[in-house]
């Protein structure tokens, strides 16, 4: 039960960390907006909550000396995957901090990625104003105010990693995977190929179509008659 719970938490953390990673890649680009910065804040907070919950359960499980060998090995594999998620989260938070400081939203700036679209857009922007954009205008310093909080959270994640390594000593190089890297992809591809091959074999092994057999017979007879006529003409000449 504890292992399944840890797997579920780790799966949620993995997805949230991946989502945060993709969001960070757009900071400083032409699609960078206050909506994005708010989404980044919510996503990293969710990731930190999941990290705390996952780390607590894995720590309790791995410090249990009554665990069976196979059960401990499985928890150690989960621990290594969890450590990788935390490392990625910390690196992405540091990247978001650096990009957020370099590309503030409400300041003259050049976007990190340019779309090539130019021209006056003030009239279109005026028509596109909404309640949310007006609220953003009132909270124009959101991204600047969030940077100190993000910096503190980066330090907290680093401290969490150090604290975990002090509580549970699981060297990553001692944990063996149950299957080779990318085995899921290879197994899926082979399953698809085998199913396709099975279909083609069944199609080839099916009964012969009578109409096709009749057409082949007629064609063979016509061909034989043509060859016989050609031989007769050759002898007469």
Curated annotation (Swiss-Prot):
One of its GO terms (biological process) is detection of light stimulus involved in visual perception. The keyword Ribonucleoprotein does not apply. Residues 234-237 are extracellular. Disruption phenotype: Mice show light responses that recover at a abnormally slow rate. Residues 30-54 form a coiled coil. It is a single-pass type IV membrane protein. InterPro entries: RGS7BP/RGS9BP. Predominantly expressed in photoreceptors of the retina. Weakly expressed in other areas of the central nervous system. Keywords: Coiled coil, Membrane, Sensory transduction, Signal transduction inhibitor, Transmembrane, Transmembrane helix, Vision. Residues 153-202 are annotated as: SNARE-like. Residues 1-212 are cytoplasmic. The chain crosses the membrane at residues 213-233. One of its GO terms (cellular component) is membrane. It is found in: Membrane. Specifically interacts with isoform RGS9-1 of RGS9. Interaction is decreased when RGS9-1 is phosphorylated at 'Ser-475'. Component of the RGS9-1-Gbeta5 complex composed of RGS9-1, Gbeta5 (GNB5) and RGS9BP. Regulator of G protein-coupled receptor (GPCR) signaling in phototransduction. Participates in the recovery phase of visual transduction via its interaction with RGS9-1 isoform. Acts as a membrane-anchor that mediates the targeting of RGS9-1 to the photoreceptor outer segment, where phototransduction takes place. Enhances the ability of RGS9-1 to stimulate G protein GTPase activity, allowing the visual signal to be terminated on the physiologically time scale. It also controls the proteolytic stability of RGS9-1, probably by protecting it from degradation. Belongs to the RGS7BP/RGS9BP family. This is Regulator of G-protein signaling 9-binding protein. The gene is Rgs9bp.
């Amino acid at each position: 039960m504890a292992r399944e719970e840890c797997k579920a938490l780790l799966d949620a953390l993995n997805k949230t960390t991946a989502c945060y990673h993709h969001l960070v890649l757009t900071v400083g680009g032409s699609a960078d907006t206050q909506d994005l910065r708010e989404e980044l804040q919510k996503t990293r907070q969710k990731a930190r909550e999941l990290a705390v919950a996952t780390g607590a359960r894995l720590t309790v499980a791995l410090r249990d000396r009554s665990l069976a060998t196979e059960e401990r090995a499985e928890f150690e594999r989960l621990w290594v995957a969890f450590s990788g998620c935390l490392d990625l989260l910390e690196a992405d938070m540091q990247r978001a901090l650096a990009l957020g400081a370099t590309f503030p939203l409400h300041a003259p700036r050049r976007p990190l990625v340019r779309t090539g679209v130019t021209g006056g857009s003030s009239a279109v922007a005026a028509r596109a104003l909404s309640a949310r954009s007006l609220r953003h205008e009132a909270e124009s310093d959101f991204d600047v105010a969030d940077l100190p909080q993000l910096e503190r959270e980066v330090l907290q994640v680093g401290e969490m990693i150090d604290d975990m390594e002090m509580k549970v000593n699981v060297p990553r190089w001692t944990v063996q995977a149950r299957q080779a890297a990318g085995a899921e992809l290879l197994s899926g591809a082979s399953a698809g190929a085998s199913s396709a091959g099975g279909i083609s074999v069944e199609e080839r092994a099916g009964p012969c179509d009578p109409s096709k057999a009749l057409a082949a017979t007629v064609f063979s007879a016509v061909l034989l008659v043509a060859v016989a006529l050609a031989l007769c003409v050759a002898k007469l000449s």
